[in-house]
């Protein structure tokens, strides 16, 4: 028997407990600006830490390979129903353990090794699972990539021409570092014109889409994949939305195709997050995410920094650092010393190596969860610029860190 009072982390494993406490403090003390990170609610975390972690449930609700699944069936069905309602989807699979596995599930369902796929170039803002050479998608399939035009928007004309020429079996839309709105309807029409499947990976934009502040790809795509964290503010995991005609193929692709027993405690966290996302408060939050990102971009531009594409229409932006004579790697480290957490990121046609880069990626979801609004977004933009204007001055870094501390104390993550 486990006596709850005796089996606490601090008693069983002081080393892990100490690391968790230190990470808790880091999250409170630093302003999180990594666009793919966010803070989940205590309710989501409680679901993930529940006894559902003990239950094996291979299969799907009402059709399991194990007994005793009557309650996890309820949880999974709630997650399915809620995510369908959230995005207006005909069918959904909530079992993928990650966004990458959600993408892999679609590939396994409709492609064979050697088929041609077409996705956005990683070097111009795409994602590694859309055909990067070292990724499974790049090793198993023939990959053709589309990119940006001179205005650093997606070159839709070139995309259409390439699709007509190469006739891919699957066209992929979605990005990991692209700030503008994606015309899913237009790409969907291109796919339809050549008889290709159309998949949208909306992982980075899902929260905005759920709230109606970014275009919804669901009406235009055969498959829509997403993570459940990032802007959606749920647990780390994945989901596939699809047309009803593809539901059987996708379900078979996930189980038994690429996964075994689903993580029921994580699916519970997904269900809770989807319920949160259906509220008016979540819509207001996403509206603020977009407002904060716009102010952040405007502030950085006013301070002499170049934003790739010239603006943001979402939650994310790429900052070109070449004019400051500092690499993304160095900027990430120095901003981190000031308690401003960003990630280095390649910019289009980046001359630096992928682990060095000429840019940083900055996003507003996590700081908005803290309660930051336009005033705080402007302060954060100026603090970033203050660091980058004088990155090797220890006194400057310390002064910025003090201002960050004042902000984080006013806006705790978990009150």
From Swiss-Prot:
It is found in: Cytoplasm. Gene3D superfamilies: Aspartate Aminotransferase, domain 1 (3.90.1150.10), Type I PLP-dependent aspartate aminotransferase-like (Major domain) (3.40.640.10). The record marks 229 as: Plays an important role in substrate specificity. One of its GO terms (biological process) is glycine biosynthetic process from serine. Its cofactor is pyridoxal 5'-phosphate. The keyword Acetylation does not apply. The modification N6-(pyridoxal phosphate)lysine is found at residue 230. GO terms for molecular function: glycine hydroxymethyltransferase activity; pyridoxal phosphate binding. (6S)-5,6,7,8-tetrahydrofolate binds at residues 122, 126-128. Pathway: One-carbon metabolism; tetrahydrofolate interconversion; Amino-acid biosynthesis; glycine biosynthesis; glycine from L-serine: step 1/1. Pfam families: SHMT (PF00464). It comes from the Bacteria. Keywords: Amino-acid biosynthesis, Cytoplasm, One-carbon metabolism, Pyridoxal phosphate, Transferase. Homodimer. HAMAP family: SHMT (MF_00051). This is Serine hydroxymethyltransferase.
């Amino acid at each position: 028997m486990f006596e709850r009072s005796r089996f606490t982390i601090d008693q069983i494993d002081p080393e892990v407990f100490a690391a968790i406490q230190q990470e808790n403090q880091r999250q409170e003390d630093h302003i999180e600006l990594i666009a793919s990170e966010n803070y989940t609610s205590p309710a989501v975390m409680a679901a993930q830490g529940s006894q559902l972690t003990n239950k094996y449930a291979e299969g799907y609700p009402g059709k399991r390979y194990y007994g005793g699944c009557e309650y996890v069936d309820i949880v999974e069905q709630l997650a399915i129903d809620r995510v369908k309602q959230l995005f207006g989807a005909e069918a959904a699979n909530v079992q993928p353990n990650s966004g990458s596995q959600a993408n892999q599930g679609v590939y396994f369902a409709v492609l064979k090794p050697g088929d041609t796929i077409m996705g956005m170039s990683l070097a111009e803002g795409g994602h590694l699972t859309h055909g990067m050479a070292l990724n499974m998608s790049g090793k198993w399939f023939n990959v053709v990539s589309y990119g940006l035009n001179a205005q650093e928007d997606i070159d839709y004309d070139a995309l259409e021409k390439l699709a007509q020429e190469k006739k891919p079996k699957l066209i992929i839309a979605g990005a990991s570092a692209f700030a503008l709105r994606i015309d899913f309807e237009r790409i969907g029409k291109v796919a339809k014109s050549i008889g290709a499947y159309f998949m949208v990976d909306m992982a980075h934009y899902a929260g905005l889409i759920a709230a109606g502040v970014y275009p919804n790809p669901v009406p235009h795509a055969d498959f829509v994949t997403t993570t459940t964290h990032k802007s959606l503010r749920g647990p780390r995991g994945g989901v596939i939305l699809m047309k009803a005609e593809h539901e059987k193929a996708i379900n078979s692709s996930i189980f038994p195709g690429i996964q075994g027993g689903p993580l029921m405690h994580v699916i519970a966290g997904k269900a809770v997050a989807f319920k949160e996302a259906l509220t008016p408060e979540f819509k207001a939050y996403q509206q603020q995410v977009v407002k904060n990102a716009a102010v952040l971009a405007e502030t950085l531009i006013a301070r002499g920094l170049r934003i790739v594409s010239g603006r943001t229409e979402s939650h994310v932006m790429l900052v070109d650092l070449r004019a400051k004579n500092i690499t993304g790697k160095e900027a990430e480290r120095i901003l981190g010393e000031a308690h401003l957490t960003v990630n280095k990121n390649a910019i289009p046609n980046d001359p630096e190596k992928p682990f060095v880069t000429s840019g940083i990626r900055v996003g507003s979801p996590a700081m908005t969860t803290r309660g930051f609004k336009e005033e705080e977004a402007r302060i954060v933009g100026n603090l970033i610029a203050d660091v980058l204007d004088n990155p090797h001055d220890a006194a400057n870094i310390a002064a910025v860190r003090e201002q960050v501390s004042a902000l984080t104390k006013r806006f705790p993550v978990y009150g």
